[in-house]
């Protein structure tokens, strides 16, 4: 049995199924590059048969990412599997992940199939997938609520057909650690050919036990792959959190006895990127990546940490990518210094054009804000990278406001519509409301505002504001993000970014869950 734990990240597939977390192809590519930089073993880049957009994203990521295995989900039918294989053609290392439900409830109510039909479809699906790659994963959806004898029968058959990874899905988060761990152990013991495959765990967090169940599957059950997402992103209560799994196994190697090959210093930067793109803010007390994860307010704790860090810290903040807020550049800093700092932060841009645009944004910010922090630089680069890769139907130009006590504020927004400048003016219940009304008065998108959120990127009154706007139209939900020291300007940028995503519509098939 290998002493390495394989990390399978499904942020781009299962994580994206969280309502409001839909990502564009360009955003998926940015996250995939960060995951590769982190040395994630397997990246599930999407569900190729769900939409042309997902197919294109998988195909592009497969061509760009060379150091991680790229995976596509596929239902247990030839059409889905063929689509996955086509999307994965450019990959250095490709995996097809096929699945079918095996619980009595799912077979009867959802699939309307008999156990024998499910057995045959699972077996034939793996056989067909093996025509394209030797790396085939099979998941029995709702495996934790499946009949044990039937589950053993199905898994023995798919391993015989060539499945190299068997993923035990706790699809609805029903499992508890001891029972789930013993389920994985029992399957490995009872299935005669279980030694021919790596067993994997995939847990949801409906009862708050996704990480605990996954770790039990590893320790008790002998699983050697964990399926997880950055920040625990996922539908309902989310998925197993990658950062918590990795740091638990790494910090408690004395207990788990396993190695993880990830560069953990990339955890926090990747967490921040996913949070910014999806608009899902990380709670301050979230383990590993929360803002308070390494903060000590108690005087006793502070005294202990000052004397010896290991009195109250079992991990080092810098080991997961936390950096202290420090002034790094100023208005007199040149392009080379800016580029050098990007390299030190592990931030890459795809072209000199993007670098030049980011540098100009930096110089503009330095004229308006006396102290520039690493977080400011990362926010600038992230937004410029997104703008460079997105097709901008609308583009923010300028904003002016007027308000007086006792009167409704008025906003005037200038923005480009396919290269032609238009001006919108409106009043509202506040400056942000007036700004959105001014934009909407010219655009007439008919969208509904679902979320408006503001976060300070750094500390102090000069901090840049990062605004997330979530819009909904015709059942489609998109996020837009904008940053600026002026919160209202950041709001306008975020609203326009969301409108651009609505304009580039990609209809996606709602996949079955694993």
UniProtKB/Swiss-Prot annotation:
Record GO biological process: L-leucine biosynthetic process
Binding annotation for Mn(2+): 14, 202, 204, 239
Molecular functions per Gene Ontology: 2-isopropylmalate synthase activity; acetyl-CoA C-acetyltransferase activity; manganese ion binding
Cofactor: Mn(2+)
A GO cellular-component term linked to this record: cytosol
EC number, UniProt record: 2.3.3.13
Keyword tags: Amino-acid biosynthesis, Branched-chain amino acid biosynthesis, Cytoplasm, Leucine biosynthesis, Manganese, Metal-binding, Transferase
Pathway: Amino-acid biosynthesis; L-leucine biosynthesis; L-leucine from 3-methyl-2-oxobutanoate: step 1/4
Stretches assigned to the Pyruvate carboxyltransferase domain: 5-268
Pfam families to which the protein is assigned, alphabetical: HCS_D2, HMGL-like, LeuA_dimer
Main location: cytoplasm
Disulfide bonds: none
Subcellular location: Cytoplasm
Region (Regulatory domain) location: 395-514
Catalytic activity: 3-methyl-2-oxobutanoate + acetyl-CoA + H2O = (2S)-2-isopropylmalate + CoA + H(+)
Self-association state and partner proteins as the record states: Homodimer.
Its job: Catalyzes the condensation of the acetyl group of acetyl-CoA with 3-methyl-2-oxobutanoate (2-ketoisovalerate) to form 3-carboxy-3-hydroxy-4-methylpentanoate (2-isopropylmalate).
Family stated for the protein in its record: Belongs to the alpha-IPM synthase/homocitrate synthase family. LeuA type 1 subfamily.
Protein name: 2-isopropylmalate synthase
Species of provenance: Burkholderia ambifaria (strain MC40-6)
């Amino acid at each position: 049995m290998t002493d390495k734990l394989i990390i399978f990240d499904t942020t781009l597939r299962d994580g994206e199924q969280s309502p409001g977390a839909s990502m564009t192809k360009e955003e998926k590519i940015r996250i995939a590059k960060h995951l590769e930089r982190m040395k994630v073993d397997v990246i599930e880049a999407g569900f190729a048969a769900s939409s042309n957009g997902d197919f294109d994203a998988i195909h592009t990521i497969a061509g760009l990412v060379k150091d991680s295995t790229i995976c596509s989900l596929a239902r247990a039918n030839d059409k889905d599997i063929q689509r996955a294989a086509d999307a994965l053609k450019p990959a250095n290392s490709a995996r097809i992940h096929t699945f079918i439900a095996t619980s009595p409830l799912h077979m009867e109510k959802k699939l309307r199939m008999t156990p024998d039909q499910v057995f045959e479809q699972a077996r034939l699906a793996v056989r067909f997938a093996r025509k394209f790659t030797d790396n085939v994963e099979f998941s029995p959806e709702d495996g934790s609520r499946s009949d044990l004898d039937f589950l053993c029968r199905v898994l023995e058959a798919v391993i015989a057909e060539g499945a190299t990874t068997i993923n035990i899905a706790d699809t609805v988060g029903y499992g508890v650690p001891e029972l789930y761990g013993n389920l994985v152990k029992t399957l490995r013991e009872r299935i005669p050919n279980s030694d021919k495959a790596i067993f994997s765990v995939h847990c949801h967090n409906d009862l708050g036990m996704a990480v605990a169940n996954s770790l039990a599957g590893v320790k008790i059950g002998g699983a050697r792959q964990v399926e997880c997402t950055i920040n625990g992103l996922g539908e309902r209560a989310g998925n197993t959190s990658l950062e918590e799994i990795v740091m638990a196994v790494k910090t408690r190697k004395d207990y788990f006895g396993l190695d993880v090959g990830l560069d953990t210093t990339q955890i926090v930067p990747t967490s921040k990127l996913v949070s910014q793109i999806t608009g899902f803010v990380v709670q301050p007390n979230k383990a590993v990546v929360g803002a308070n994860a390494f903060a000590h307010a108690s005087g006793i704790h502070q005294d202990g940490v000052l004397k010896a860090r290991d009195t109250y810290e079992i991990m080092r903040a810098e080991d997961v990518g936390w950096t202290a807020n420090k002034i790094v550049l100023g208005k007199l800093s040149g392009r080379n210094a800016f580029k050098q700092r990007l390299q030190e932060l592990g931030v890459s841009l795809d072209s000199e054009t993007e670098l030049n645009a980011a540098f100009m944004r930096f110089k503009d910010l330095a004229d308006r804000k006396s102290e520039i922090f690493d977080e400011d630089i990362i926010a600038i680069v992230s937004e410029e990278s997104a703008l460079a890769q997105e097709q901008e139907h609308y583009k923010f130009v300028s904003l002016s406001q007027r308000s007086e006590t006792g009167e409704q504020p008025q906003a005037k927004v200038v923005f480009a519509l396919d290269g032609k400048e238009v001006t919108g003016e409106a009043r509202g219940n506040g400056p942000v409301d007036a700004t959105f009304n001014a934009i909407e008065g010219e655009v007439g998108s008919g969208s509904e505002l679902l979320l408006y959120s503001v976060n300070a990127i750094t500390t102090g009154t000069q901090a840049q504001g990062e605004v997330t706007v979530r819009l909904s139209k015709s059942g489609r939900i998109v996020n837009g993000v904008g940053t600026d020291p002026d919160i209202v300007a950041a709001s306008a940028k975020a609203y326009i970014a969301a409108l651009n995503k609505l304009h580039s519509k990609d209809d996606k098939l709602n996949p079955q869950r694993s």
